[in-house]
Amino acid sequence: MKVFILALLALAATTAIAQLETTCSQGFGQSQQQQQPGQRQLLEQMKPCVAFLQQKCSPLRMPFLQTQVEQLSSCQIVQYQCCQQLAQIPERTRCHAIHIVVEAIIQQQSQQQWQEPQQQAQHKSMRMLLENLSLMCNIYVPVQCQQQQQLGQQQQQQLQEQLTPCTTFLQQQCSPVTVPFPQIPVDQPTSCQNVQHQCCRQLSQIPEQFRCQAIHNVAEAIRQQQPQQQWQGMYQPQQPAQLESIRMSLQALRSMRSIYIPVQCPAPTTYNIPLVATYTGGAC
């Protein structure tokens, strides 16, 4: 598996700043055996997170590896930008904004791909986008557009530019795309954002005192699945870079449905995980 699954998530669980000898919380202290859910149970709950981190998103730049991945934006970051832009659009205009995005996507598709009238395909795609973007961004989008509202050409162009991240996200960043365009099969039942939603939901259901351990388990599971040769050539970053990465990771995790994650989240003494991670910026 390629190195693209490395970035910053496990980093938030492995705060390698001379704190690896402490525990995630008091729940992992002397009463650990009585209070802590089983490692396998936590990992089972976090399976969507593992799947999301490993398979669903394109790579992020990893400054801690000698081999740089030049793509600056991952699936999650573009998704987050999409949600931000959509949230800034007035509620009464969101349906039209999404309609413009769909039309732009359809226009970019080869005409040979369509076996049904373009208007019907457009309506179908718009319905799918309405459902998925409402869930993905956790904001209200009307089910039906108010067709009597007329938008000028300049306003339409402005909306299309404003939702460029959404277009990028839907076309390029996830596998598979959530909108099943004609003749483009969707083989996997879950899309990137759906798996991320499951990940958020599972994480929110885990008691606060065990979330550090749960995130740590995800990091450990991902690390164990990596071929050993992928870890060669890694160098230890300087402490300021570590601190900045940890801060970004914790901030991103806390933004996921406002899930509380302790600011101090060191790894248990029994798990001395290397400094590797996957970053999941973006809202659920």
From Swiss-Prot:
Family named by the database record: Belongs to the prolamin family.
Signal peptide (from-to): 1-18
GO MF entries: nutrient reservoir activity
Superkingdom as given in the UniProt entry: Eukaryota
Name the UniProt record assigns to this protein: Avenin-like b10
PTM comment, free text: Contains disulfide bonds.
A Pfam family: Gliadin
SUPFAM superfamilies: Bifunctional inhibitor/lipid-transfer protein/seed storage 2S albumin
Biological role: Seed storage protein. Might be integrated via inter-chain disulfide bonds within the glutenin polymer.
Keywords for this protein: Disulfide bond, Seed storage protein, Signal, Storage protein
